[in-house]
Amino acid sequence: MVVADVVTEFIEGLVETYPGLQYLDGFPEVKVVIRADASGATYDKVAVISGGGSGHEPAHAGFVGEGMLTASICGDVFASPSVDSILAGIRAVTGPMGCLLIVMNYTGDRLNFGLAAEQARSEGYKIETVIVGDDCALPPLLGIAGRRGLAGTIFVNKIAGAAAAAGLSLADVAAEAKRASQMVGTMGVALSVCTLPGQVTSDRLGPGKMELGLGIHGEPGAAVADLQPVDVVVSHILKQILSSVCSYCGASLSFLTPCRLPLPSRKT
């Protein structure tokens, strides 16, 4: 396996599997996946674009489709996509209704998407941006750059995509996405750290240990603890997300299980 080809091969496989998707001219240097039925010149709805570093599949290219993303901008593994790639994606799918950029709260993503948005506006495109920072592992004051963007971005993508599909204006789609981003909170639990293709897996987490709030790129979490029964882990996570420190509240909850964790369960 050639490490540099990992992202390219993922995109090729995705597009070959789903005929409703395509990639832009310039691939693989420009790693942009778009809906095959979305053409900027004629697209009559708000375009919803997200993206970021690869290595978190199915995010974000796997979320391109009707009622969700119009396009996904893919960087290399754990690397923000370039300004040129983001701008190419905007130009490809943005019509008269404008474009909403959904950006996870990481410095590189915010910088590159922000620069691309400024350039697109200077070319006459209508652009709005929503930043998603849903990580509840660390109190706000302990996060220098603010909360990290995590799996809660999926909800923001879906709500924005549904609003765009319904024909709402750019301002209304952005407002719905912003409200969703303010209402979502996420905390993860990991039994091992992430592994980059072609590199040795870290042994920082030993057997029988788990890390609460480990970052999706291997950033330190809130604490390392002994492995606990799943009900204890879930209870701790919910208390953190719903605490006054994190400022999330609501009468209903939704749960995402992005991967199976072999946590021990209690015998009843």
Regions found by a protein language model. Name each.
Residues V46-G53, L69-S72, G98-T107, G114-A117, ...:
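Short glycine-rich or small-residue beta-strand-to-loop segments that form or flank ligand, phosphate
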Residues H56, H60-P96, S235, K239-S244:
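Glycine-rich oxoanion-binding loops at beta->alpha junctions
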Residues M1-V48:
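N-terminal amphipathic/basic leader segments beginning at the initiator methionine
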Residues R110-Y125, G143:
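Short Gly/Thr/Asp-enriched flexible loops that form oxyanion-binding sites at enzyme active sites
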Residues A164-T268:
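Mixed-charge interfacial surface used for oligomerization/domain docking
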Residues E57-H60, V83-L87, G108-G114, A137-P140, ...:
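Short glycine/serine/threonine-rich phosphate/pyrophosphate-binding segments
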Residues V132-M183:
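Short alpha-helices
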Residues Y43-G51, H60-I73, A137-P140, M210-D226, ...:
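Gly-rich Lys/Arg/Thr-decorated short loops/hinges at beta-loop-alpha junctions or inter-strand turns
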